[in-house]
Amino acid sequence: MSLGLVGRKVGMTRIFTAEGDSIPVTVLDVSDNRVTQIKTVETDGYTAVQVAFGSRRASRVTKPLAGHLAKAGVEAGEILKEFRIDAAKAAELSNGAVVGADLFEVGQKVDVQGVSIGKGYAGTIKRYNFSSGRATHGNSRSHNVPGSIGMAQDPGRVFPGKRMTGHLGDVTVTVQNLEIARIDAERKLLLVKGAIPGAKGGKVFVTPAVKTKGAK
C-alpha cells in the first residue's frame, strides 16, 4: 500500500546515458496531484488518500462533487483517484497538499496502469497472432478465417474461452517493474524506461512496484 501519482502520457522519446547508450522512455506529466480527501479507519473503514489531477470547468462539476472539493479547498480536477496507504503515511498528508514527481526517485521501479488503444473489431490474425491460410494451392476464400471452432455432436458446443474475432484494445493494462530513468522536477515530468499502454494524452496511474525484490 503506497501513495502513487496520476499522470498524463505526453509521448515517447529517448535519452542518452553517460556511456552513450540510447534509452527509450515515455514522458509522463504528473503535475498538480492535489489531495482532496484522507480516509481513515474510523470514518471510512480503511485508510486511503484521494487525489485530484488536471483541471475542469466549474460548470462541468456536479454540486455534490463541488462541495466535496470546496471542503478540501481544492480546485476541480479532471479525474479523482484513490490510493490505499498506511495510516502513518496518511497522517503526514493534509487536504490541499500537492504531491509531485519528487515522490519517486531515479532508478526506482514502478507499476504503470493505463487504458490500451482501442483497435475496434479485429480478426484472429491481428487479435491473437494466428497464421493466415495459404494464398494459393487450392485455398479459396479461406485466407484469413480462423478455421474450425468446435467438434462434432460430442461435445456439441464451442468451449468457453475459444479465441475468436472480437473487440481488440481499450482495456485496462498494468505494466510492472518499469524503471524511472529521469525526473524533471521543474517541469513535473517523469521519464519512464520503456513503453506505457494508452494513447498520447491518456491518463495513467503510477505506483511503486509491488513484485520486485528490493523495490524502493
Swiss-Prot record:
The modification N5-methylglutamine is found at Q153. One of its GO terms (cellular component) is cytosolic large ribosomal subunit. Methylated by PrmB. GO terms for molecular function: rRNA binding; structural constituent of ribosome. Signal peptide: none annotated. It comes from the Bacteria. PROSITE patterns: RIBOSOMAL_L3. Belongs to the universal ribosomal protein uL3 family. Part of the 50S ribosomal subunit. Forms a cluster with proteins L14 and L19. NCBIfam families: L3_bact (TIGR03625). This is Large ribosomal subunit protein uL3. It comes from Burkholderia ambifaria (strain MC40-6).
